[in-house]
Amino acid sequence: MRILVTFAVEAEFAPWRKRHGFTRIEIGIPQRNTNQTSYEVYEANVAETDVDVLLTGIGWEDLFHNVAHKALRDLLKRKPDCCVSTGLAGGLNREFRSGNIVAASQLILREGGGMILSNKKLLKVAESCGAKVADTLITERHIVSEASSKSAMSKFGDFVDMESYHILQVVSGTQIPAIAVRGISDAVDRDVPLDFNKVLDHDGTVRKRRLIEEIIRNPLRIPSIIRFGLQSSQASRAVADFLVKFVSSLANYDGRVAASAYGEVAAR
């Protein structure tokens, strides 16, 4: 069995990576209109399952320059039995607290567009492994930092990220079963203490000068920044714990997880 797992950045992947012997593979990109000439894939055998991990970066860049889109399409040619979009997300539903693992029944874009569904069998497996199943995951263009903004968005969804809709949209054209499962880093009633849109690069690298400037501008936020960092680390470890159970559970299935439900992961 083979599965494809996507995270946005290394920090989200790190707790799971440490538990298994993932090998980093660099794959070249021929004739691309971008400064990036390759992408990295991490490979391991987990619970008798071949696992490919792709780090997509934060958000989803313009398609013309989107290396993650190219990499995802390449990895789907390996015919994985399913695809999992995971990592961290912000909570919109008051029932979800930091560290909760939440799976999305459906995904929408903040700016509108068609709805995408997670695979029903994968949702059942995720729930059996401890995930809470929510109605709607919203994919946004930027990190939603303010509690007031999250509260306003809660009318339309239960949690928010920046990648999952785009990932499942690409996968939907292949009829490979897919699911979005995220760890909650910040609850709906909590401000994110920094504007991470300013201090993080696309690959998750911290812009140290910007970070220092933000801290100097708001020194009273230092305790909140530390607390948020600890919560994010806890949520990433919770994702790793979930994936251990999830991959082991998938290994109990023969053939494709959704052999009887190929049309479920589709935009409508």
Model regions and ranges:
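Alpha-helical scaffold segments in soluble metabolic enzymes
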Residues: 15, 74, 125, 170, ...
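Glycine- and other small-residue-rich loops at beta-strand/loop junctions that grip anionic moieties
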Residues: 56, 181, 228
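Conserved active-site and cofactor/substrate-binding residues in soluble primary-metabolism enzymes
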Residues: 7-11, 62, 66-67, 117, ...
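Active-site rim beta-loop-alpha module in soluble metabolic enzymes
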Residues: 116-200
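Acidic, Ser/Thr-rich low-complexity intrinsically disordered segments
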Residues: 261-268
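Metabolite-binding pocket within alpha/beta catalytic cores that recognizes anionic/polar moieties
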Residues: 1-125, 133, 158, 173
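Glycine-rich anion-binding loop/nest that anchors nucleotide
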Residues: 7-8, 83-87, 178-188, 247-250
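Regulatory input/activation interfaces that engage signals or partners
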Residues: 184-260
